[in-house]
Amino acid sequence: MDHRLLEIVACPVCNGRLYFNKEKLELICKADGLAYPVRDGIPVLLENEARKLGADEITQ
């Protein structure tokens, strides 16, 4: 994931910062506890595509 892209994309729910999880290929919003998938290098920033994070995943 290009670091320049991470500087401009934001969570579609809260407009908060997103963090890239390289192992799971997801963009993480810690504020909302959501993980957005990255498919073929393209972030899928749709709320209905997001996965709810467990409490242990948010703190990582």
From Swiss-Prot:
Pfam families: Trm112p. Disulfide bonds: none annotated. SUPFAM superfamilies: Trm112p-like. It comes from the Bacteria. InterPro entries: Trm112-like. GO terms for cellular component: cytosol. HAMAP family: UPF0434 (MF_01187). Belongs to the UPF0434 family. This is UPF0434 protein ECA2555.
